[in-house]
Amino acid sequence: MSYIPKQQRDKVSSYKNLRSLYEQNITVNSISETMDTCHLHEDAEMIRRMMVIKDYDVLGVEDKGIVIGYVVRNELKEGSCEEYYRSFSPTELVSESTPLIDTLFFLKEIDRIFILEGNRVTKVVTLADLQKPPIRMLLFGLISLLEMHLYRIINHYFPEDTWKTHLNTNRISLAEELFSLRKSQNEAIQLSDCLQICDKRDIVLNEKPLRERLGIETKSKGNHYFKQLEKLRNNLAHSQNINTQNSWDEMFLLIEQTEKLLGACEKM
């Protein structure tokens, strides 16, 4: 086991605290929608028309004042809602205090989750809710944390700007220009503060021992991952759909990979 200097440990601890803020203090309630309900014996076609008008995909079903399940709009035809309602599956139910990041992984497996307040189902979350600001803030926070860790690790592994050997002259010049500009504004920085995420990517991927310690199997896989991460960050920064160029499955995989890489960074 390698020795981690106290200053490095303190930084890792502060990053963990920041990560905890994103992952534990923002809950599923921040993106959930209050779920309207219909009665078990109401006419299914009438309820479907109402759901179309209100743009509901699902609607809770009540019987004797208790929400016992839900109906899916596209499944409703002739008859009563009793013929079409689905009982809640245990895998579809989560507590209102569930961390938001866990919600992402639940929705990897199912189309919707329902929120329990006490012993009553009151709210719903679907894939469409993953475009909301709290999710965007969470994802941007995870990417920012990863960049902070990479900055820390690069400074530790490459003292006195020896990371320059892994960048081309154009990228170094761009960093130096930004460094000069920021120094002229009396910012207390070093050259590595001016590296972009693509620079950090190239430095890490070109240093094989470091790449392997971070659990990145090959340089090509690492390049693919970081390019997808940059696309996501750009979409977040410019208020584009999170999965503009990716399916949700690809997005969930990217988040899982980021979580894994963050875990490796925290051990260094």
Q: What is each of the regions a protein language model found here?
A:
Residues 1-268:
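Tandem CBS (Cystathionine beta-synthase) repeat/Bateman regulatory domains
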